[in-house]
């Protein structure tokens, strides 16, 4: 004699199994859409070097530390970048020498490297 056991219940209710999978998929899809919108909310962020120099570049965690030339504006050098919200590290390359802006917040790595740090907020 064959009898149904509680463990066999899932075999006969395959529709119930699919429902949570669909709900889970929709939840994932929602999370992805929210993340896309969050990353798309870049904020115009001004970087200014006031320490003089002839050639000034900006490098940071927001551009994989590649050199971005700053534009001379009167006695300063300026760049305006659209950055995603969050914390970013950066420093300046002034006439071939890496430096940070002593008038802005800094963070020191375990290796002793000093970078400026900026919080981009809404």
Swiss-Prot record:
Q: Mind telling me which CDD domains this protein's record contains?
A: E_set_AMPKbeta_like_N
Entries under InterPro entries matching the protein: AMPK1_CBM, CRP1_MDG1_kinase, Ig-like_fold, Ig_E-set
- Does the entry feature the keyword Lipid metabolism, yes or no? yes
PTM (free text): Phosphorylated when associated with the catalytic subunit (PRKAA1 or PRKAA2). Phosphorylated by ULK1; leading to negatively regulate AMPK activity and suggesting the existence of a regulatory feedback loop between ULK1 and AMPK.
Q: Which residues form a coiled coil?
A: none
Q: How does it assemble?
A: AMPK is a heterotrimer of an alpha catalytic subunit (PRKAA1 or PRKAA2), a beta (PRKAB1 or PRKAB2) and a gamma non-catalytic subunits (PRKAG1, PRKAG2 or PRKAG3). Interacts with FNIP1 and FNIP2.
Instruction: Fill in the domain comment.
Output: The glycogen-binding domain may target AMPK to glycogen so that other factors like glycogen-bound debranching enzyme or protein phosphatases can directly affect AMPK activity.
One Pfam match, given by its short name, reads AMPK1_CBM
The role this protein plays is: Non-catalytic subunit of AMP-activated protein kinase (AMPK), an energy sensor protein kinase that plays a key role in regulating cellular energy metabolism. In response to reduction of intracellular ATP levels, AMPK activates energy-producing pathways and inhibits energy-consuming processes: inhibits protein, carbohydrate and lipid biosynthesis, as well as cell growth and proliferation. AMPK acts via direct phosphorylation of metabolic enzymes, and by longer-term effects via phosphorylation of transcription regulators.
Q: Which residues carry this modification: Phosphoserine?
A: 5, 61, 66, 73
Region (Glycogen-binding domain) spans which residues? 33-122
Q: Which UniProt keywords apply?
A: Fatty acid biosynthesis, Fatty acid metabolism, Lipid biosynthesis, Lipid metabolism, Phosphoprotein
Sequence positions bearing Phosphothreonine: 113
What Gene3D superfamilies does UniProt report for this protein, alphabetically? Immunoglobulins
Family statement: Belongs to the 5'-AMP-activated protein kinase beta subunit family.
* One of the GO BP terms on file: fatty acid biosynthetic process
Q: What is this protein called?
A: 5'-AMP-activated protein kinase subunit beta-1
